[in-house]
Amino acid sequence: MKKQRNLRSMAAQAVEQVVEQGQSLSNILPPLQQKVSDKDKALLQELCFGVLRTLSQLDWLINKLMARPMTGKQRTVHYLIMVGLYQLLYTRIPPHAALAETVEGAIAIKRPQLKGLINGVLRQFQRQQEELLAKFNASDARYLHPSWLLKRLQKAYPEQWQSIVEANNQRPPMWLRVNRTHHSRDSWLALLDEAGMKGFPHADYPDAVRLETPAPVHALPGFEDGWVTVQDASAQGCMTWLAPQNGEHILDLCAAPGGKTTHILEVAPEAQVVAVDIDEQRLSRVYDNLKRLGMKATVKQGDGRYPSQWCGEQQFDRILLDAPCSATGVIRRHPDIKWLRRDRDIPELAQLQSEILDAIWPHLKSGGTLVYATCSVLPEENSLQIKAFLQRTADAELCETGTPEQPGKQNLPGAEEGDGFFYAKLIKK
């Protein structure tokens, strides 16, 4: 039996690590969840994701409720108060329980002398809630995005930025990919129905299913046997443009955690696939996914800027480059991105993408296909990136995705309930 822990203090410390230390919630949360009971795992996740999703609102409220900010060793208390405010605003937890558990969190973070302060701030919010929220809703903080990102979205999408922001602030649906080597989508949907769950097929992507209600993966029919994989619908769109064929040599570059590698092998089981990623730790997830689905691929650690180091002079029939990016298209799924990214990251990422494109292009066979993909919505990483590449690369031709003036296909967050995603299909003349 697992020791009873204070979930509010755990959530506060996790959020602090994201915001103050730049750590990814994807790395922080799983080890914390191992320390709590199964019934508490979901609440811990809800508190962490929820606070990060609404961080700018909670920060704004604390600045109004407190005379001066908590600093130094007391900074964790700032995030503990955020957790308390989030519960009062967005959860069905009874207010008295939310207050009591949050105040007790002060003991867990070794600040028992501040219990009175935490209690006082939260009770003050309860008294002034209506007035404070009216003022908040008249401020730019209501968009729940950092100002630098808001400015970029407003510039890139003058007519659509508000709908993008709204989609980013929603909870994401759970999308699945049915393994067509085991089941047709319709036959797996019938199994899902028998298991008491409901799913909906995507109109454009032939393997994609959206669950009516998110569910644990172990509850999904055949998950352990590789019948189905969790993957957003927009990410599945890569296969529409890549169109892998049996017998081809295909490179999946920047492949971790392996969702697209295994999708290639589902579509073309006899393809020779090489999966490469710079992050050796994340490659372990590629191996895990291949094993669960009973598939084989050549997996290598390598830097996309220096392909000769890991593939020599080898050329490929098709290349999928899922380029490192700002991930601004998947904020609803990873709200910590809003606070991990900085404005200065964008030109640096664009430069890295450009270097990888230039380095990998010679490894594409004449007549071959390269699909450039990102989970970003920023033009500097997407249409402008491809436009510049086409201008400097004489034997590259845009195919099926956009025009030379506006290259690529941009999915915006929430469109057809998918994530924000960009694709450009290039052919080597």
Curated annotation (Swiss-Prot):
Could you provide one GO biological process annotation from this protein's UniProt record?
A: regulation of DNA-templated transcription
Q: Name it.
A: Ribosomal RNA small subunit methyltransferase B
Gene Ontology cellular-component terms listed? cytosol
Could you tell me which cysteines form disulfide bridges? none
Q: State the EC number(s).
A: 2.1.1.176
- Superkingdom of origin: Bacteria
UniProt lists the family membership as follows: Belongs to the class I-like SAM-binding methyltransferase superfamily. RsmB/NOP family.
The entry's localization annotation reads: Cytoplasm
Q: Which GO molecular-function terms appear in the entry?
A: RNA binding; rRNA (cytosine-C5-)-methyltransferase activity
Q: Which InterPro entries match?
A: MeTrfase_RsmB-F_NOP2_cat, MeTrfase_RsmB-F_NOP2_dom, NusB-like_sf, NusB_RsmB_TIM44, RCMT, rRNA_ssu_MeTfrase_B, rRNA_ssu_MeTfrase_B_ent, RsmB-like_ferredoxin
* Key words, A-Z: Cytoplasm, Methyltransferase, RNA-binding, rRNA processing, S-adenosyl-L-methionine, Transferase
In terms of NCBIfam families, this protein maps to: PRK10901.1 (NF008149), PRK14902.1 (NF011494), rsmB (TIGR00563)
Q: Which reaction does it catalyse?
A: cytidine(967) in 16S rRNA + S-adenosyl-L-methionine = 5-methylcytidine(967) in 16S rRNA + S-adenosyl-L-homocysteine + H(+)
Q: Which HAMAP family match?
A: 16SrRNA_methyltr_B
* Record-listed S-adenosyl-L-methionine binding positions: 254-260, 277, 303, 322
What SUPFAM superfamilies does UniProt report for this protein, alphabetically?
A: NusB-like (SSF48013), S-adenosyl-L-methionine-dependent methyltransferases (SSF53335)
Quote the catalytic residue positions: 375
